[in-house]
C-alpha cells in the first residue's frame, strides 16, 4: 500500500431579467437535468459554488461544461454530497484541456482511508447504499428523484417570492402565476412525502437486516475501528476482509478499490491509500 500525503488544496441576483426557471417533471423523470439547468442541481446541492461555476463557465467551452455535468465522476460527488475543492476544479480544467471527448474518464479522487470521515464518505455509505439496493432495486432512483424534487421545491419558492414582489405592478399576471406555483408546490410536496415514506420503509428493512450499522458508525468515529459493524451481511465479506487489513497489507487498498469499481461505486481513476 502506498504511503503518501493526501494534499488537498453573493449570492447571484435571483430576479435578474425577471426570468425564473423551474426544473420540469419531464427532465426529472429522465434522472438528469439537461443543459445549464444541470448547474442548478449541483449549485442547489452545494456541490459547486457560485464562484466555481462562474470560473468553469468562463474557462470551459459549452460542450465541455455539458460533458462535465453528465459525467459519472461529478454525479458520484453529487450522490455523496461532496463539494468540489480547489484541487478538484484544477483537475477538471487540466483534463478538459485534452483533445479527447473521453476526458471525463480521467477524473478521479485520492482518498486516505485512514481518515474515518473519508472511509465513511467514499466506502461505507456507498457500500451501504449498494447493499440496500439489493433489498429493493428502486431505492437509488427514489433517492435521486428526492434530491431533484427538493431542488425543484426551492426553485418554486424563488418563483413565488418573485411574483409576490411584483404583485403591485402586475396584479393580474402575478395572481395567475402565484396560483400556478402554489399548485406545483402542492404536487411537489406530495411527491416528496411519497418518496420519503418509501425510503423510510426501506431504511427500516435495512436496519433489521444489518442491526449493527449505526453502532459501527459511532465506533468508527470514536476509535477508528470497523469491529462495531460486525456481524456484516454475507455479501460484503469479500470487501470486509481487505478493509480490515488496510493498516498492515500493502495490497488491501487496491483490493478495496477494485471491489468498489466492479460495482460502479468508484471511478477507475480513484486512488485509495492508507496513511495514519
UniProtKB/Swiss-Prot annotation:
GO biological process, one term: negative regulation of protein secretion
Gene3D superfamilies recorded: 1.20.1270.190, ExsD N-terminal domain-like
Disruption phenotype: Absence of ExsD leads to transcription of the type III secretion system (T3SS) regulon derepression.
UniProt-listed InterPro entries: ExsD_C, ExsD_dom1, ExsD_dom2, ExsD_M, ExsD_N
Described purpose of this protein according to its UniProt entry: Negative regulator of the type III secretion system regulon. Acts by disrupting transcriptional activator ExsA self-association and DNA-binding activity in absence of inducing signals. Upon host cell contact, this interaction is disrupted by the anti-antiactivator protein ExsC leading to ExsA activation.
Subunit and partners: Can form homotrimer. Interacts with ExsA; this interaction inhibits ExsA activity. Interacts with ExsC; this interaction dissociates the ExsD-ExsA complex.
Protein name: Transcriptional antiactivator ExsD
Organism: Pseudomonas aeruginosa (strain ATCC 15692 / DSM 22644 / CIP 104116 / JCM 14847 / LMG 12228 / 1C / PRS 101 / PAO1)
Amino acid at each position: 500500500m502506498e504511503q503518501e500525503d493526501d494534499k488537498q488544496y453573493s449570492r447571484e441576483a435571483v430576479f435578474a431579467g425577471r426570468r425564473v426557471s423551474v426544473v420540469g417533471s419531464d427532465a426529472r423523470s429522465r434522472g438528469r437535468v439537461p443543459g445549464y439547468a444541470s448547474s442548478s442541481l449541483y449549485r442547489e446541492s452545494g456541490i459547486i459554488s457560485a464562484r466555481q461555476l462562474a470560473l468553469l463557465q468562463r474557462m470551459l467551452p459549452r460542450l465541455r461544461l455539458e460533458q462535465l455535468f453528465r459525467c459519472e465522476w461529478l454525479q458520484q460527488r453529487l450522490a455523496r454530497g461532496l463539494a468540489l475543492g480547489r484541487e478538484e476544479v484544477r483537475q477538471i480544467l487540466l483534463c478538459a484541456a485534452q483533445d479527447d471527448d473521453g476526458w471525463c474518464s480521467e477524473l478521479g479522487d485520492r482518498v486516505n482511508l485512514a481518515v474515518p470521515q473519508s472511509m465513511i464518505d467514499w466506502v461505507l455509505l456507498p457500500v451501504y447504499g449498494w447493499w440496500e439496493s439489493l433489498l429493493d432495486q428502486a431505492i437509488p432512483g427514489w433517492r435521486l428523484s428526492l434530491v431533484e424534487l427538493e431542488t425543484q421545491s426551492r426553485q418554486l419558492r424563488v418563483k413565488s417570492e418573485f411574483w409576490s414582489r411584483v404583485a403591485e405592478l402586475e396584479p393580474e399576471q402575478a395572481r395567475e402565476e402565484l396560483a400556478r406555483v402554489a399548485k406545483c408546490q402542492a404536487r411537489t410536496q406530495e411527491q416528496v412525502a411519497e418518496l420519503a415514506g418509501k425510503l423510510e420503509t426501506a431504511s427500516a428493512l435495512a436496519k433489521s437486516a444489518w442491526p449493527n450499522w449505526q453502532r459501527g458508525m459511532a465506533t468508527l468515529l470514536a476509535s477508528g475501528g470497523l469491529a462495531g459493524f460486525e456481524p456484516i451481511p454475507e455479501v460484503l465479506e469479500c470487501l470486509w476482509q481487505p478493509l480490515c487489513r488496510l493498516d498492515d497489507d500493502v495490497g488491501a487498498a487496491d483490493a478495496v478499490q477494485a471491489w468498489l469499481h466492479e460495482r460502479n461505486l468508484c471511478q477507475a481513476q480513484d486512488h485509495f491509500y492508507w496513511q495514519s
